[in-house]
């Protein structure tokens, strides 16, 4: 029994923090896990920048409401779900992801939660588990699934390498060069074909 595990940002939807950085005029918020592999460090730094600028959850949600999935992402996901169980595994937060999941046809999403004060200030974050992507893939394997995984970033490498088949999708030149053994694709139809092939 196969189950496909996909990263979300950079694979199906634009990077939320990059979109927010552009809309808010705070270019330093463009830093993502592609640049900083330590997610805790990255998030604590982001929260500090938000606090410094007096920006809270509402401001970020207003931007997210205007973000659409990447062109072709919904069709790709619909096609993939027609022949595979699919779980989206992301380091994003439920409070950010809801409007985007609506636009993708409400797929199953495993992610994290923000801690938000009554005034809307994001005060912290609660990770579901340590190394959530790798931990989730291993848990699925422990209950009899063969996993196929794809993502674009450093924090996807664990689940990609631990899966029966794993692929980079629209990743950086550096990650592709550092991990030449992982097949890398740029187009949804290529990724679909690779996933189908892995299930044979």
Question: Can you annotate each of these PLM segments?
Answer:
Residues 94-98, 156-157, 192:
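Short, well-ordered alpha-helical microsegments
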Residues 78, 138, 157-158:
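Alpha-helical segments flanking ligand/cofactor-binding loops in enzyme cores
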Residues 2-113, 117-118:
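Alpha-helical substrate-recognition element adjacent to the catalytic core
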Residues 86-91, 145-186:
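Acidic, Mg2+-coordinating phosphoryl-transfer loop and its flanking beta/alpha structural elements
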């Amino acid at each position: 029994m196969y189950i496909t595990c996909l990263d979300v940002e950079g694979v199906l939807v634009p990077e939320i923090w990059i979109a927010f950085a552009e809309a808010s005029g705070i270019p330093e918020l463009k830093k993502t896990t592609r640049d900083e592999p330590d997610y805790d460090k990255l998030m604590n730094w982001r929260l500090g920048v938000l606090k410094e600028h007096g920006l809270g959850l509402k401001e970020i949600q207003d931007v997210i409401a205007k973000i659409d999935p990447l062109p072709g992402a919904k069709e790709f996901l619909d096609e993939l779900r027609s022949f595979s169980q699919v779980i989206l595994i992301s380091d994003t937060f439920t409070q950010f992801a809801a409007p985007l999941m609506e636009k993708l046809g409400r797929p199953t999403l495993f992610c994290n939660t923000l801690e938000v004060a009554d005034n809307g200030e994001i005060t912290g974050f609660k990770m579901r588990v340590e190394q959530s992507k790798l931990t989730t893939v291993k848990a699925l394997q422990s209950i009899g699934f063969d996993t196929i995984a794809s993502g674009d970033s450093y924090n996807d490498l664990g689940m990609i390498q631990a899966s029966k088949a794993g692929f980079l999708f629209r990743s950086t030149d550096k990650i592709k060069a550092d991990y030449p053994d992982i097949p890398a694709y740029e187009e949804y139809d290529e990724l679909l074909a690779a996933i189908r092939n892995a299930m044979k």
